[in-house]
Regions:
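Non-catalytic, conserved peripheral segments adjacent to functional cores
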Residues: 1-99, 114-129
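Beta-rich strand-turn-strand
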Residues: 106-113
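Short beta-strand-centered segments at strand-helix junctions
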Residues: 101-104
Length: 129
């Protein structure tokens, strides 16, 4: 982790990561997760997906000025969060449950199942550290 991130981390702590739950519906046909503008804690600037193989590591960066929502819509994702004072490990494996990560939190993500898919919804395009 670099010095600039450590400075940002003085203001942003792991404890400020928030759990986010989307509406979820299940019946005999399958599952449906719904994300609408009013149900998201941030305004959407862009959406991107990442699919990776088992034990692939991604992210390994922090956003300097941008909050982001992270969901694992298929498979399982282990997210290690680091604010330069404390580390926390979170497991995402339900498409309706995600996390809102504030700027300055270093993220390392490991895909625990083949073809796991992550959706990221950043508040705005941001600079990575």
């Amino acid at each position: 982790m670099n010095r600039e991130l450590a400075e940002i981390g003085k203001k942003t702590r792991i404890d400020s990561i928030k759990e986010v739950s989307l509406d979820f519906y299940k019946d005999e046909r399958g599952d449906l997760t719904v994300a609408e503008e009013h149900s998201l804690p941030i305004k959407i600037a862009r959406i991107f997906t990442v699919r990776a193989q088992q034990e692939s590591n991604r992210a390994n960066h922090a956003h300097k000025e941008c909050s982001q929502l992270i969901f694992c819509v298929s498979g399982e994702l282990v997210v290690v969060c680091d604010d330069s004072f404390k580390k926390s490990t979170l497991i995402l494996n339900n498409p309706s449950d995600g996390i809102l990560v504030p700027p300055g939190i270093w993220l390392e993500q490991t895909y625990k199942k083949n073809n796991s898919i992550r959706i990221d919804i950043p508040r705005r395009p941001g600079k990575m550290l």
